[in-house]
Every structure is written in C-alpha cells, then in structure tokens.
Amino acid sequence: MPKQVKGLLGEKLGMTQVFDESGRVIPVTVVRAGPCVVTQVRTPDRDGYSAVQLGYGAVDPRRVNKPLAGHFRAAGVTPRRYLAEVRTGDAAEYTVGQEVTVEIFTPGQRVDVAGVSKGKGFAGLMKRHNFRGLPDSHGTERKHRSPGSIGACATPGRVFKGLRMAGRMGGRRVTVQNLAVQAVKPEENLLLLQGAVPGPNGGLVYVRTAAKGKANRDGGAA
C-alpha cells in the first residue's frame, strides 16, 4: 500500500515552554501551519507519480508572473506566495481548491520540519567547524584562530577536496527529523513542536509526516 504523507507549509513564530502531565518542562517551537489550499493534484496516469501541490501565504496578484497566474486561475484559487508538493499515495482523495489545516496532525505524532537555517555570513573555522584553534601563548603570533596546516608541500602538494575551511555559514535548507507534536490548536492554526526547528522567527517551514516512522509516545507508529 502506498505510503500516506501529510504535509503543511507554515511560519515559525518562536519558542516557548509547556508542562507535561508530570510537571516536566518541555521546550516547544510554535508554528503557524496553514491553512493551505490544494492548487494541483498529480496522478500516476498523467504525471507519473502521485502528489498534492499546496499553496500558502497571501501575495499581491500584481506580483505574480503570468504562468503562475494562469496556474492559479485554472485551479480556481487566489494566488499564493509559496507552493510545495507533498508526495503521497492518497493524492486522489484530495480535490483542487480544498483547504488543508493543522487538524491533519495529532498530539504525540512525529513529524519532520524543513526550513532554511539562519545565515551567519562568512565565518571562520572555530565558529563554523568548532576547531580548537592554535595555542594562546608559546610563540603564537596573530594566528590564534587559524586552522594550522592544510597540507604539506611536495606530498600531497595540494589541498584535499572537502577540507574543512572558513566560508559561508548557514542559510541552507535543513531538515530536523522526528519532532513530537505537543499540541494542535486548530482555532489558531498553531502547532506546538517539541524542540527547535530551523530558521529565524517568521521564516517559512515545511512540516510533514516523519519519514523514518519513529513510534509515537502512545506506542503507535507515526
């Protein structure tokens, strides 16, 4: 049976904490997820695979290019700022124009969250790769945060590919797996997810059913 995957686009609002039944403090990230609208349904017969395309976020129609404007017009929905595709085996159960809300998730369920990590700009080795650096004394002069040797002269006579060096840090798509859904608040379109998710407050995130199927806290499979 094809795997059924649920997914939503949303916005990271920030972090807070909640208390469980035993009074234990649990750090959670608050995500405003959806509502999303189905803008296209892909089928194996027509497209070669089964998926649902979701639209999220308001956008000025004047800022939508003509191909996308025609796409939204054909679907009969107002233009959306973001589009994402969810590959799922039950795509045929969706209809174009249908609204998808946070109610597709349940407390205790495990989800994966993808987003773009905070950009740190050009960073050195100690910040980017957690290098120790050179000694603070014993003759070290203006080289305390340098990498040290990156290769010998004649052998190998070059710098190996993939060597950890300074460079741009952050600003990349990151997926955090198997976060537990602590609470679902449909009236506010909010998800409370245990732990941290990538990106800054206000950043776009994609929440979907956990790919690795870790067991729920109540014993069922995610």
Curated annotation (Swiss-Prot):
Keywords: Ribonucleoprotein, Ribosomal protein, RNA-binding, rRNA-binding. One of its GO terms (biological process) is translation. Transmembrane segments: none annotated. One of its GO terms (molecular function) is rRNA binding. The keyword Ribonucleoprotein applies. Residues 129-150 are annotated as: Disordered. InterPro entries: Ribosomal_uL3, Ribosomal_uL3_bac/org-type, Ribosomal_uL3_CS, Transl_B-barrel_sf. Coiled coil: none annotated. GO terms for cellular component: cytosolic large ribosomal subunit. Belongs to the universal ribosomal protein uL3 family. One of the primary rRNA binding proteins, it binds directly near the 3'-end of the 23S rRNA, where it nucleates assembly of the 50S subunit. Part of the 50S ribosomal subunit. Forms a cluster with proteins L14 and L19. This is Large ribosomal subunit protein uL3.
